[in-house]
Regions:
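Surface-exposed beta-loop interaction hotspot
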Residues: 93-109
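Acidic, aromatic-enriched beta-alpha/helix-loop junctions
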Residues: 42-92
Length: 109
């Protein structure tokens, strides 16, 4: 069930919306749009700007999918922290986990 959505937001509105959604227990967070993806961990990658789907599930797992293919570009089994902040005029989700220590970042363009 779709509980809330935002269309074509500016960076400030997207940051506020996503952080509000992340505070709601048991919510699925799905963001589709143009973004850059960075992950310096086990399978390091830096994806150029493109259309991606970012999913943060109620079990705190994170997946980032490209427009093609069935496997995610990045998958984190459980993130402890996933704040959304503004950086350089863009909304950025920075998901972190402690064990192993790694992070994934999605910058929404």
């Amino acid at each position: 069930m779709l509980l809330s959505w935002i269309e074509d937001p500016n960076a400030d509105d997207l940051v506020a919306f996503l952080n509000d959604e992340l505070r709601q227990p048991g919510r699925w967070l799905q963001v589709a749009g143009e973004m850059e993806v960075e992950y310096p961990g086990r399978a390091a990658n830096m994806e150029s700007a493109g259309d991606y789907l970012l999913i943060l599930k109620p079990d705190a797992s994170l997946q980032i999918h490209a427009a093609r293919g069935i496997k995610p570009l990045n998958w984190q089994p459980q993130v402890e922290n996933a704040p959304v902040m503004q950086d350089g005029g863009r909304a950025v989700l920075h998901a972190e986990r402690r064990s192993p220590a790694e992070w994934a970042r999605g910058a929404f363009l």
